[in-house]
Amino acid sequence: MAFNEDVGALVIDNGSGMCKAGFAGDDAPRAVFPSIVGRPRHQGVMVGMGQKDSYVGDEAQSKRGILTLKYPIEHGIVTNWDDMEKIWHHTFYNELRVAPEEHPVLLTEAPLNPKANREKMTQIVFETFNSPAMYVAIQAVLSLYASGRTTGIVLDSGDGVTHTVPIYEGYALPHAILRLDMAGRDLTDYLMKILTERGYSFTTTAEREIVRDIKEKLCYVALDFEQEMSNAASSSALEKTYELPDGQVITIGNERFRCPEALFQPNFLGLESVGIHETTYNSIMKCDLDIRKDLYANTVLSGGSTMYPGIADRMQKEISALAPSTMKIKIVAPPERKYSVWIGGSILASLSTFQQMWISKQEYDESGPAIVHRKCF
């Protein structure tokens, strides 16, 4: 199918925490906003404000005091389609200011996304938004493309879920994908808890956002946790201060590395699962012997919860301890990894060789939503 070359494709990466959207060929998303939909708690509390029945993204975030906030994407999977439609509508009309019926749309999906979900996504894009063409790509695969590779294992950790996804020659290997229901949101909650132990109280959803900011600005991963704990106990060199919106200044010490340590020791959160290093190793071990070497040498970090300073060195150390002693291990942590899923989508959708891969409206009309399984894999 030949598109008018000047009409750029749209790339939308829907994460549990943030939606990243923009134009294929750009090197960064134009719009990044929270994946939330808010509805007024009390009818008519803002008389004459021209009150809407729902708010999306930053506007919902700023009016959170009078709204009930919902996340339509939980653990990477869309669970509320009405709200998801609102987020897409907001993306097209308010953030990107485009007419969806004029642009092909590339959407992303979580690894192991249920079949019915991919079909529903496809149906909404064609029937509600009348797009001329669309494609659904697996998030981790796009991150790998963004790093300039087609074979490797991606550790993708965002706000709602963490996956380890082995990929060979551009195809994810579903039998070896592992999912960990522990990600950024859990780390924020954990930091709220351990700051409370220090005597600072953070309880409301509004205060959770403050703690998320503290986490993003001050947390790091220790290379040796026990050693770091004793360093923190014997000196105040690791302490940092943070000014709260009301002007109060708080001090944070070992919490800085205790919080993200939960990625390696989920028992800190009361979870039974193994850490991200062991999950990555287990994922590699589920793959064919012949490709393991390529996976160890191309371990790519992706997503906002891999942004902690020190995480790549720690992964290198932990995986080296698990792998055969002669194995070459390389952890790739691109500086732009917070957006590498989106960037990979931008690269893919602008390749000339990709243009025949789009599902066209015509193909959809002939075959229905199931076409997505034949054309996107």
Swiss-Prot record:
Family to which this protein belongs: Belongs to the actin family.
CDD domains, per database record: ASKHA_NBD_actin (cd10224)
Its biological purpose: Actins are highly conserved proteins that are involved in various types of cell motility and are ubiquitously expressed in all eukaryotic cells.
Keyword terms of this UniProt record: ATP-binding, Cytoplasm, Cytoskeleton, Hydrolase, Nucleotide-binding
Record's keyword annotation contains Nucleotide-binding: yes
InterPro entries on file: Actin, Actin/actin-like_CS, Actin_CS, ATPase_NBD
Catalytic activity line of the entry: ATP + H2O = ADP + phosphate + H(+)
Coiled coil location: none
Main location: cytoplasm
EC code(s) of this entry: 3.6.4.-
Subcellular location: Cytoplasm, Cytoskeleton
Range of residues in the leader sequence: none
Molecular functions per Gene Ontology: ATP binding; hydrolase activity
Pfam families: Actin
Primary gene name: ACT3
Stated name of the protein: Actin-3
EC category: hydrolase
Superkingdom, taxonomy of origin: Eukaryota
GO CC term (a single one): cytoplasm
SUPFAM superfamilies: Actin-like ATPase domain (SSF53067)
UniProt lineage: Eukaryota, Metazoa, Spiralia, Lophotrochozoa, Platyhelminthes
